[in-house]
Amino acid sequence: MNNIIVGMGEALWDVLPEGKKIGGAPANFAYHVSQFGFDSRVVSAVGRDELGEEILKVFNEKKLKMQIEQVDYPTGTVQVTLDDEGVPCYEIKEGVAWDNIPFTDELKRLALSTRAVCFGSLAQRNEVSRATINRFLDTMPDIDGQLKIFDINLRQDFYSKEVLRESFHRCNVLKINDEELVTISRMFGYPGIDLQDKCWILLAKYNLKMLILTCGINGSYVFTPGPRQCKICAAIGKDKAPRLRERK
């Protein structure tokens, strides 16, 4: 059966002034999918260290199915500090475990049983994980209803035009926020100032099944091929789903 839904990419700890909290969009995605009763997996890598063991423990406690390799790199962390005005500043550590997700025989078997996968741009900052993500996408069987969801997440300088273009071509669903859309439009030279026009350009250029534009408190928009109309979704807080948190 090809009905597994996968969240693939970074698994890490956000280290805040008040303590650490588990983070990573792929794990968040897989967790919330599982809460709807679907068969999900999180695919990532952690280190052979205490932080890595803690991530595995949290996922097990949450009954989140996973395919996580332990590798000879430290478990990923994001250092969160506050400036003098209380604005958070983020430092995403480099050379960590989720930068080095290996493509194993077990991962190949998972890809062959996957109907939908969600991946981002951050986990592709390193060549090893980028190659693994692309091999996974290319290994997935070409079946009706298959979804390759690119949840773009532009962080610091951990993205490039080449990686983004390749991901646009490999995905069939794109999720992007309004700030990221402005950045992408500048990088690729998309004309006009209307955000919806830019979404239609992306939808057509990359033959997407769907494009989801999130605009924070201003709501979200869903674009699909066909007549130019889009569905407006109500705003519920920020553009990100509630995060998976460590059990207290």
Range-by-range predicted roles:
Residues G19, G52-E53, T104, S129-A131, ...:
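Conserved strand-to-helix beginnings and helix N-cap segments that scaffold or border functional pockets
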Residues G9-E10, S44, F150-I152, I176, ...:
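Active-site flanking residues adjacent to catalytic metal/cofactor-binding acidic residues
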Residues D39-S121, D138-D144:
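Conserved N-terminal subdomain of the carbohydrate kinase-like
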Residues R109-L110, E166-S167, A204:
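Structural alpha-helical scaffold elements that stabilize or flank donor/cofactor-binding regions
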